[in-house]
Amino acid sequence: MTEVVPSSALSEVSLRLLCHDDIDTVKHLCGDWFPIEYPDSWYRDITSNKKFFSLAATYRGAIVGMIVAEIKNRTKIHKEDGDILASSFSVDTQVAYILSLGVVKEFRKHGIGSLLLESLKDHISTTAQDHCKAIYLHVLTTNNTAINFYENRDFRQHHYLPYYYSIRGVLKDGFTYVLYINGGHPPWTILDYIQHLGSALANLSPCSIPHRIYRQAHSLLCSFLPWSSISSKGGIEYSRTM
């Protein structure tokens, strides 16, 4: 497709689910967009299997973009991404995995990728409601265009995956990117626990614990977090009448 795309193209874009008749077109598009070769069974699955959310963006009848995602229980997350969610979430908590998101070159920077991503979020809110806590994906470390796209939409790098991809016999590194939704979050780190302790101390009334113990805990915390907002200069004031 080499036609000049008008700036108003997004207003003419329609969305529909992929179907079996789209297989040849989708194969051609994925060959242009991605360096990975997918088996024929993959194309059959994403165009026919209802477990996939496979949405096409069309312009004047032609597919110019698509997103393929799967909403699944957290127990089905592959081992390398098993810590996307904190262990406190129940086993029936769901996540959404983006298998593919692409837009025809001439139609990029027209908002079509964002439209497809927002449509996935709408689908999640309708089907999984608040049971889905994260949307995640994998991307080549060298794919700066995709990385910038996701980072600009609040996805954050979660893992570095060395030798994750095999492309024409050559091993390539990847990243896992995650967008947390509906209160989802990763496991806490040591820094998270320290910051939580700092917040808890900041909310305590000094009169509720012995003055001396409070001062010792406060000093210890500040030694870990010199930037802490509960410093004695700008934080809690002590009463001299305690």
Curated annotation (Swiss-Prot):
Residues 193-236 dip into the membrane without crossing it. The gene is Naa60. It comes from Rattus norvegicus (Rat). Residues 162-173 are annotated as: Required for homodimerization. Residues 1-192, 237-242 are cytoplasmic. Monomer and homodimer; monomer in presence of substrate and homodimer in its absence. Pfam families: Acetyltransf_1. GO terms for cellular component: Golgi membrane. PROSITE patterns: GNAT (PS51186). GO terms for biological process: cell population proliferation; chromosome segregation; N-terminal peptidyl-methionine acetylation; N-terminal protein amino acid acetylation; nucleosome assembly. Acetylated: autoacetylation is required for optimal acetyltransferase activity. Signal peptide: none annotated. It is an enzyme of class 2 (transferase). Its main location: Golgi. Its EC number is 2.3.1.259, 2.3.1.48. Residues 13-182 form the N-acetyltransferase domain. It is a peripheral membrane protein. This is N-alpha-acetyltransferase 60. The active site is at Y97, H138. Keywords: Acetylation, Acyltransferase, Chromatin regulator, Chromosome partition, Golgi apparatus, Membrane, Transferase. N-alpha-acetyltransferase that specifically mediates the acetylation of N-terminal residues of the transmembrane proteins, with a strong preference for N-termini facing the cytosol. Displays N-terminal acetyltransferase activity towards a range of N-terminal sequences including those starting with Met-Lys, Met-Val, Met-Ala and Met-Met. Required for normal chromosomal segregation during anaphase. May also show histone acetyltransferase activity; such results are however unclear in vivo and would require additional experimental evidences. Belongs to the acetyltransferase family. NAA60 subfamily. The keyword ATP-binding does not apply. It comes from the Eukaryota. The modification N6-acetyllysine is found at K79, K105, K109, K121. Acetyl-CoA binds at L101, G102, V103, K109, H110, G111, I112, G113, S114, N143, Y150, E151, N152, R153.
